[in-house]
Every structure is written in structure tokens, then in C-alpha cells.
Amino acid sequence: MKTGWLNQGGSWYYLTDSGSMKTGWQKVNGTWYYLNGSGAMQTGWLNQSGTWYYLNNSGSMQTGWLSQSGTWYYLTDSGSMKTGWYQVNTKWYYSYSSGALAVSTTVEGYTVNANGEWI
């Protein structure tokens, strides 16, 4: 009986020790993956109940800073995309409702530099 990861028709599926297919959020060897309703592993942006997540090309959930096409996004330790004002270590940042980091501009009267840091 096949268990673990299975590549079928170009999609990846995860099978339990009993051979049943998993769906939803699954933590495999310390890494989070999202398997859709048919069990296929998802990649790219995922909107779940109004919260955005990013799953990289290997399907693992991204955390921390993410750059896509010259735009930066910040994903929390739980994988959710940040918007509005937030603090990372000792610095403050602002991301628009799209999740895109504000850079070299003024937001709500506060200036952010080219790195998106409030100055």
C-alpha cells in the first residue's frame, strides 16, 4: 500500500499510514502544506476564509519576507499575510490591503523608506 507523498497526473497527494488521502492543512515532517478538497497539494497564493497564505513551488507554507515581481510581502510565523502597520523585530512597516509593502512614501502621515521601514 502506498503511503506518504504520491505524484499522480502531475499533482501531489499525501497518503496516511492507512493509505487514506489527506485534505486541508497538513504538517509533514515539520512543514505545513495545504491539500485542496480533492487532496491535491496547492502552490502559490491561497485565500482561506479571507486570510492569504503563500505556498512555494514545493508546496510548503512560506513565512517571513516574500518578494514577487519586485513587490515585498510579509507572512507571519503562522503563514498569514500581514496588512496595515506591523512590527518585525525593532522596525515598523506598512502593507496595503493587497499585502504589498509600502516603500518610499508617506502613509497616514508617517514616512517609510525604500526598504519599507518607518523613519
Give short role names for the model-derived ranges.
Residues 1-119:
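Extracellular adhesion/carbohydrate-binding repeat motifs centered on closely spaced tryptophans
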